[in-house]
Amino acid sequence: FLEDCQRLLADVANAEASVSAGGVRANGHLRVTAPAGFGRRHVAPLVPRFLAEQPEVTLSLNLSDRVVDLAAEGFDCAVRVGDLRDSALGSVRLADNRRLCVATPEYLRRNGTPRHPSELVQHDCLTLSSEASQTRGWAFRMPTQAGGAEVVHLKPAGPMDCSDGQVLYDWCLAGHGIAWRSTWEVEGDIAAGRLVAVLEDFAAPPNGIYAIFPSARHL
């Protein structure tokens, strides 16, 4: 997974170099935006290494769970986690992104373990607030009457929501409810027993982690 993340900044450098005649060495200032949690863990640590390899480049990193308008706000590249909606943007898929419902063992002992997504209404669900990027809710793979399966989006409620995914993660680790988080964030906690995955049989297929550019000419 780290290798996929390292490709991100290389893609940015190649994109900027490609708009120069003859593929001249990348130079100038890059503005990159990424989701706060993913950016802190996987993008920010790579910036110094990237700049060491590209000494004529400077870089500003914006971390926000808001969906940024690249063209209107002057960004050269965005990292997007999830489904892409704007087909006018150029994109490079970096890695798969799988999400799971997780909670602490203590929370599940107190409140029980949901066996079906419909039972989430009985639980304290920790959700991103409406101004964040997760507008469709939590995705689940549900059986159909025809014997197949379809992805259904639910918007569970709870006593707390936040626009910052790191806060939801912290609340979940503190035992305040069930959160729907990416495996890159919680797989270590699951392995260590700090968090337990629930409703795994209903987990939706993975979507993607992408590098997004204002124009396909960068690809």
Listing of model-derived features with the role each one plays in the protein:
Residues 18, 33, 60-64, 198, ...:
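Solvent-exposed beta-strand sheet faces enriched in polar/charged residues
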Residues 31-33, 78, 126, 179, ...:
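Short, well-ordered beta-strand segments
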Residues 50, 59-61, 171, 195, ...:
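Hydrophobic packing within well-folded, soluble alpha/beta domains
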Residues 10-33:
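Short helix-loop hinge/linker segments at domain boundaries
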Residues 1-11:
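Basic, amphipathic "hinge/linker" alpha-helix immediately C-terminal to the N-terminal HTH DNA-binding motif
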Residues 27-91:
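Central regulatory/effector-binding core of bacterial HTH transcription factors
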Residues 72, 84-209:
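C-terminal regulatory
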Residues 209-219:
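A bilobed periplasmic-binding-protein/Venus flytrap-type ligand-binding module shared by bacterial periplasmic
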